[in-house]
From Swiss-Prot:
Pathway stated in the Swiss-Prot or TrEMBL entry: Cofactor biosynthesis; thiamine diphosphate biosynthesis; thiamine diphosphate from thiamine: step 1/1
Tissue: Expressed in leaves and at lower levels in flowers.
CDD domains, per the entry: TPK
Species assigned in the record: Arabidopsis thaliana
Localization annotation: Cytoplasm, Cytosol
Protein family according to the UniProt entry: Belongs to the thiamine pyrophosphokinase family.
Cellular component GO terms, alphabetical: cytosol
Entries under PANTHER family matching the protein: THIAMIN PYROPHOSPHOKINASE (PTHR13622), THIAMIN PYROPHOSPHOKINASE 1 (PTHR13622:SF8)
Taxonomic placement: Eukaryota, Viridiplantae, Streptophyta, Embryophyta, Tracheophyta
Keywords of this entry: ATP-binding, Cytoplasm, Kinase, Nucleotide-binding, Transferase
Name of the molecule in the record: Thiamine pyrophosphokinase 2
Main location group: cytoplasm
């Protein structure tokens, strides 16, 4: 293993109240799957909010359900995306008209059928002013997991297309992110919010050599590949997990159902 590698530090501070995020600049992408219960909190963290095509339907329909004692119109005005981008084959006309009326930028890329809607949104963020300090940028994608498997596979592929950009795929149950082989990794665990179940998975390229610390079943110069050993259903044991590998790996960890604030809005 290459002990001289730079260390990349990972933290799910976006699951904490906004005053505890340590300067990270977040962008949020909402895809066309059920919204996690903590979506309003992610929204408050984000400096830029995009809906990928039908993700706008989810914001319009589902966010008011998180605030049953407030007027849905008020909620829809509070949570307006900055940009709607995609091939525009899923967004409803009434939803599109609503957000256009209230000033959301709409980018129709129906001419591009070679990239996914998530890919289109990531590209937009990478070319935005938010990416001027790229080391501090983290992109959060909700609705990236669940539903059709080919959609999930396409979203996982986006992580590999942009290994130099910190992207986290989120569902109500877990998160997934890429650990590039170019770095050693320190993953800081918020045990009240996430875990204990976790996994390290090589996709595309086998790992001949992976070493970890902080897991119940640590790896020590271990080979991992599909058709052989992969580290699934592992358990977090320490507050800091370290990972070093000769291959890009996917890191996944469960998100607990309790302990998370549903929203961080201050009227």
């Amino acid at each position: 293993m290459l002990s001289a590698m730079d260390v990349m530090i990972h933290s799910s501070s976006f699951l904490l109240p906004c005053d505890e995020t340590c300067g990270t600049r977040y962008a949020l992408v909402v895809l066309n799957q059920n919204l996690p219960r903590f979506t309003p909190l992610l929204w408050e963290h984000a400096k830029l909010r995009l809906c990928a095509d039908g993700g706008a339907n989810r914001i319009y329909d589902e966010l008011p359900l998180f605030f049953p004692h407030e007027d849905p119109f008020v909620i829809r005005n509070r949570y307006k995306p900055d940009v709607i981008k995609g091939d525009m084959d899923s967004i409803r006309r009434d939803v599109l008209d609503f957000y256009v009326y209230w000033g959301t930028k709409v980018i129709d890329e129906s001419h591009d059928q070679d990239t996914t809607d998530l890919d289109k949104c990531i590209s937009y963020i990478r070319h935005s002013t938010l990416n001027q300090e790229s080391s501090r940028l983290q992109i959060l994608a909700t609705g990236a997991l669940g539903g059709r498997f080919d959609h999930e596979a396409g979203n996982l592929n986006v992580l590999y297309r942009y290994p130099d950009t910190r992207i986290v795929l989120l569902s109500d149950d877990c998160l997934i992110q890429l650990l590039p082989k170019t770095h050693r990794h320190e993953i800081h665990i918020h045990s009240s919010l996430q875990g204990p179940h976790c996994g390290l998975i090589p996709i595309g390229t086998p790992s001949a050599n992976t070493t970890t610390s902080g897991l119940k079943w640590d790896l020590s110069n271990t080979e991992m590949r599909f058709g052989g050993l992969i580290s699934t259903s592992n358990l977090v044991k320490e507050e800091i997990i370290t990972v070093e590998s000769d291959s890009d790996l996917l890191w996944t960890i469960s998100i607990k159902k309790t302990g998370l604030p549903v929203q961080d809005h201050k009227p």
